[in-house]
Each structure stands twice: as C-alpha cells, then as structure tokens.
C-alpha cells in the first residue's frame, strides 16, 4: 500500500471509529507525518489534520505545528490549502484560536493577492467562531510584530473587523478593541498612530461627546504640547510632523463643548514666531509642510476658548500673514506684464485665523492701534484683493460654459477649489479692510466639504503666477492629494517608536527598534524569509 492509499485508509479508520476514535492515535500521527511527504500527501494531510484535531488534545501542539509547516511550504497551492484549513483547528479551542489568529496576522504581510485573500477569509472565519480569541492573536502581533505586520493588522481591524456588524462586534468586543488599541498607542509610528485613531473613531468613542473628549485627550498626550521649545522645533522636523498628525487626529472632535485652545495656543506660541516659522521643514518641502500646519490650525481655531495673552498670540498670526501679503508695487509700470504672485492657500488659512481670533478678541488687535502698521496692513490687503479679483475673473472665464462632465476633470476640479479659496479671501478682506476691522462674515474653508464628512477633503495649494490662470496652479506646484505624508509624497520619513524622545537615529530608513519580547517572525527583521510566523 503506497503512502496516499495509507492516508486514505487512516482517514477511513478515524471517520468510522465513532466514540473510540481517541484509541487510534497511531493513525492520526501517521497523518501528521505526511506533512513531510509529497505534494499530494501534504494537501491530504492539510485537509485531514483539522477534521480530527479535537479528538487528540495530547497531540494538539504537534498538529498545530504540522499545519503551520504547510502554511510556509514552497508550493503556493499547498500554502493556500493549509491557510484555508486553519480554521478547522479553532472549533471549540480558544488556545488554538489565539495561536491561529497570531499566525494569520503574521501572514497578512503576504504580497500574493490570492494568498492574501485566503488569509483574510480564514481570519474572518475564525473571528466568527470565537471573536475575542481570534483578535487576541491579532493584538499579539500588534504588540510584538515588526512594523509591516503591525500596520497590516491595524488596517485589517479598521477595514474588515469593524465592518462585521453588531453580531460580531458586541459591546464586550468593542471594549476589548478600545482597550488594546490604547495600549498600542504607547509605542507607535506616525502611520500607526493615524490607524489607531481611525479605529478608535469608528468605535463608541467616535459617537459620543465623552468619547470625543477621550480621543482629543489621547491626541493631546501624543502631541506632548508642553515638551517642545522653539530651538527643538527649528532643527527637528519630527516635532512639527508629530504636531500636525496629532492635531489632525483631534480636529474632527473639537466643538463648542470640547475646545481646541491648547493646540491653538501651541501653534501661536511655538510654531508661528517668525524665526521658528522660517526654519520649519527647510530640508524638505517647506511650503507643503507649512500649508498642512496652517490648514489644521485654521480648522481648529473656530472652537477655541478665550486665549490668555491674546494680543501676543494674535500678533504671531498677523506677522506670519504679512509674509504672504507682499507690499504693492510702486507703480503700474513696475508690474509690467507679470501678474502679482500670491500663495492663496496659505493666505486663506491665515486670514481666516486672524478674522476668527479678532472676532473673539476684538480688543486684542494691537496692529489696529498703530497707525503705521494699520496703513501698511490695509495697503497689503488692497494689493492682495487686486490679485485675488483678477484671478477670480480668469477662473470664472475658464469655467464658464463647462458641462458637468467637463467640470469633473482634475484640472477643472482644481480651478473650482481655487475659486472657493479666492472667493473666501475676498470676503475676509472686505471685513478686515474696515477701519477698525469688522467680523460679520462667516465662511467655510475651501478644502472642507460640509455635511457628512467630518474630516473634509484636502485640495491642492494655490499660487498665482504665469501658469495659474491656465490651470489653477504654479508650474512647479504638485497637487497636495493627502493631508498627511505618504510613501509617494516623501515630505518626511517618520521616526520609529512613540512620538517622544525614543527616536531611532537612523529613522530615515524606516527601521524600527523595539525592546519587546518575541518579534514578527522570530527575529529583529521579522524573520519572514526563514519563518513566516512564531512557533510556541
């Protein structure tokens, strides 16, 4: 009898043994040994191991390891079969479910789409069998795995687990997820922080005022607002990036009840002083980093309490605004054929911030009390208004007569956003040009999509120059398609570890140093090449 026939015979004996199946240990051991056999033997072993697993508890560890061996076989078909059969080990066995969940979590880093789909299917299957034990395996990898594994696990939770509905995500399970994600926040990279806050926002925390307050508290703790000074900010891009990430995570939850005062005060005190402002991100895309900072600042400022030292803080906004409001040319001849050049997106944010703070602190606008400063400010406003109105006219002419389909093109979408930006600037200038300024108009920031979209959409920054009239952007300007850096934008490589002093000096290579037990695959590099997952 050859090995294949012997395997079928063992299967037949075990299937027909009934209550006496536990007496047939030798037959089950023979099936386990088949994981070292030919391809066909391995595929049969994968199918048979799980069928009889629960009847041989003394061989549980051996059986699980045998199945795991098949999950890392050189043959793709055998790996897929073994991954598909893993859920059979989990029926009524919490310990096995945790181990299988841990293994499948590690396999989320697979690149082959067919294999990865099978991993997802098997994970979803065991989650339906025993939700808590399954996701305990996921959180083991979030705690001890390498960076890629951690990120894939968090993405799985955000995009698949939390969409499984209340029959799976019960109150107990949701509480467990919240507790474990909070633990994970103790040591996260920038991308992991974003994923963790996305997950928490999709739980009960995202739907109640008390939950919003807790989310803001978590973001505030990560931002470490009291632990940075101007000298550090000037030389360390990570500090600014950390603030932008944390402020962006908190921004959707600020309201009349939950105030953004601490974040706004931090921007005014630590980031907007001119010396510091001009040093921000000098080694990378400075305009883009500064614009991202200004956007989140503008989003937060509406929900600020009365500021202490309001005059000094408003003056910090005013001084940076002047950087984006050039003085007018001496005469029309000086202009020649070159239109004035403005960074409208930056100007919108700063004008809105000044307008909002001025409305809340009308007696703290120190430049209004200085005749020379007020004259200078009004001259700059008038010059900006001139450039804005000229740009609005060209944009309106460019968009006139366009069909609905034509307006959906990227170029025309950009022009429409530019029109919103410049229209907002025009409205704000009208109020601020009064002597003294008035604050009667309210606007919606150009990149915010009101209703049903807390976070809003970010659009490309806008400049005014030779190419602007044609396509709504400077010839050297690339659209800012995301509100935070991605692998494509390469504004900045986030460092390893928590947003604190635990920064790996070689963070530019995206390595991660962790003082943890274990690791995603039994080694500092995750061990993927030698072994895809940990054995117990």
Curated annotation (Swiss-Prot):
Among InterPro entries, the record links this protein to: API5, ARM-like, ARM-type_fold
- List the residue ranges of the region (Disordered): 462-536
Q: What happens when the gene is disrupted?
A: Enhanced E2f1-induced apoptosis.
Respond yes or no to whether keyword Secreted is given for this record: no
Segments of skewed composition (Basic and acidic residues): 472-487
UniProt GO molecular function: RNA binding
Biased region (Polar residues) positions are 498-507
A single GO cellular-component term on record: nucleus
Short name of one Pfam family for this protein?
API5
Keyword line: Apoptosis, Nucleus
Question: What are the BP-aspect GO terms?
Answer: apoptotic process; negative regulation of apoptotic process
What family does the Swiss-Prot or TrEMBL record give for this protein? Belongs to the API5 family.
* Role summary: Antiapoptotic factor. Also known to efficiently suppress E2F1-induced apoptosis.
The name of this protein is Apoptosis inhibitor 5 homolog
Give the organism, scientific name: Drosophila melanogaster
- Lineage of producing organism: Eukaryota, Metazoa, Ecdysozoa, Arthropoda, Hexapoda
- Name the gene: cass
């Amino acid at each position: 009898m050859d090995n294949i026939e012997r395997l079928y015979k063992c299967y037949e004996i075990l299937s027909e043994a009934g209550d006496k199946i536990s007496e047939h240990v030798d037959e089950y051991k023979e099936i386990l040994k088949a994981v070292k056999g030919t391809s066909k033997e391995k595929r049969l072993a994968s199918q048979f191991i799980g069928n009889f697993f629960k009847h041989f508890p003394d061989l549980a560890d051996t059986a699980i390891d045998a199945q795991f061996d098949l999950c890392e076989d050189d043959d793709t078909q055998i790996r897929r079969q073994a991954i598909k059969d893993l859920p059979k080990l989990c029926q009524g066995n919490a310990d096995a479910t945790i181990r299988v969940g841990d293994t499948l979590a590690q396999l989320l880093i697979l690149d082959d789409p067919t294999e990865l789909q099978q991993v997802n299917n098997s994970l979803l299957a065991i989650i339906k069998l025993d939700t808590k034990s399954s996701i305990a395996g996921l959180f083991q990898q979030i705690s001890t795995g390498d960076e890629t594994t951690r990120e894939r696990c968090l993405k799985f939770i955000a995009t698949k687990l939390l969409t499984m509905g209340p029959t799976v995500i019960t109150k107990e399970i949701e509480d467990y997820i919240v507790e474990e994600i909070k633990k994970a926040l103790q040591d996260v990279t920038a991308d992991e922080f974003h994923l963790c806050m996305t997950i928490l926002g999709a739980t009960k925390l995202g739907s109640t005022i008390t939950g919003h307050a807790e989310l803001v508290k978590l973001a505030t703790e990560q931002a470490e607002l009291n632990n940075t000074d101007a000298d550090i900010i000037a030389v360390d891009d990570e500090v600014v990036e950390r603030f932008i990430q944390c402020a962006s995570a908190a921004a959707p939850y600020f309201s009349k009840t939950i105030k953004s005062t601490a974040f706004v005060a931090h921007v005014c005190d630590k980031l907007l002083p001119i010396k510091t402002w001009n040093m921000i991100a000098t080694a990378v895309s400075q305009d883009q980093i500064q614009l991202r900072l200004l956007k989140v600042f503008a989003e937060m400022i509406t929900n600020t309490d009365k500021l202490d030292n309001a005059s000094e803080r408003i003056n910090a906004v005013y001084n940076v605004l002047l950087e984006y409001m050039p003085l007018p040319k001496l005469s029309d001849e000086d202009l020649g054929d070159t239109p004035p050049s403005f960074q409208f997106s930056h100007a919108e944010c700063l004008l809105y911030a000044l307008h909002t703070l001025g409305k809340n602190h009308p007696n703290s606008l120190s430049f209004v009390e200085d005749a020379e400063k007020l004259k200078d400010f009004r001259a700059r406003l008038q010059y900006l208004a001139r450039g804005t109105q000229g740009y609005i006219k060209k944009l309106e002419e460019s968009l006139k007569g366009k069909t609905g389909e034509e307006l959906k093109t990227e170029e025309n979408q950009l022009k429409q956003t530019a029109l919103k930006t410049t229209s907002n600037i025009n409205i704000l200038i009208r109020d601020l040009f009064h002597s003294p300024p008035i604050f009667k108009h309210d606007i919606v920031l150009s990149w915010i999509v009101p209703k049903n979209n807390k976070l809003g959409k970010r659009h490309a920054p806008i400049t005014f120059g030779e190419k602007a009239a044609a396509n709504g952007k400077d010839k050297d300007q690339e659209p800012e398609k995301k509100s935070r850096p991605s692998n494509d934008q390469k504004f900045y490589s986030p460092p390893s570890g928590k947003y604190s002093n635990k920064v790996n000096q070689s963070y530019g290579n995206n390595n991660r140093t962790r003082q943890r037990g274990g690791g995603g695959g039994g080694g500092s590099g995750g061990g993927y090449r030698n072994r895809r997952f940990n054995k117990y």
